[in-house]
Amino acid sequence: MAEQKTGQKADQKIRIRLKAFDHRLIDRSASEIVETAKRTGAQVRGPIPLPTKIERYTILVSPHADKDARDQYETRTHKRVLDIIDPNDKTVDALMKLELAAGVDVQIKLT
C-alpha cells in the first residue's frame, strides 16, 4: 500500500458499479454484495442509485403510409455504485465467489 506524508497507510477502496435493465434484479444483487462485504468485516458505502438512462425508440407501424400510426418503445438502464472501504483478503475472496444474476453487469475498480 502507498503511504501518505503523515506516515499512515492510504485507505484502499473497491468501487463496484452495477448496471441492469431490471431494477429489482440490481437491488437484489446490490444487497447480496453489501451483505457479503459486511459479513467479512469490511465497511460499505451504498448502494448509491445513479440516474436511470432512458432510451426511447419510435417506429412506424405502417409499411407504406399512415405517419400517425407509430409504436414507441423504451429501455431503462438502472445503475448503482457501491464503495467497499478497507477490504481484507476475506472480503475479496468472498466477492470473487459471489454468484450474481445473469442480467447484471458488474464493473470492479480498485483504488
UniProtKB/Swiss-Prot annotation:
Q: Which UniProt keywords apply?
A: Ribonucleoprotein, Ribosomal protein
Q: Which Gene3D superfamilies match?
A: Ribosomal protein S10 domain (3.30.70.600)
Stored Pfam families: Ribosomal_S10
The biological process GO terms on file are: translation
Annotated GO CC locations = ribonucleoprotein complex; ribosome
Its annotated function is as follows: Involved in the binding of tRNA to the ribosomes.
- What PANTHER family is this protein classified in? 30S RIBOSOMAL PROTEIN S10 FAMILY MEMBER (PTHR11700)
In the record, the note on similarity to other proteins reads: Belongs to the universal ribosomal protein uS10 family.
Summarize subunit and interaction data from the UniProt record for this chain.
Part of the 30S ribosomal subunit.
This chain belongs to the protein called: Small ribosomal subunit protein uS10
| Gene that specifies this protein | rpsJ
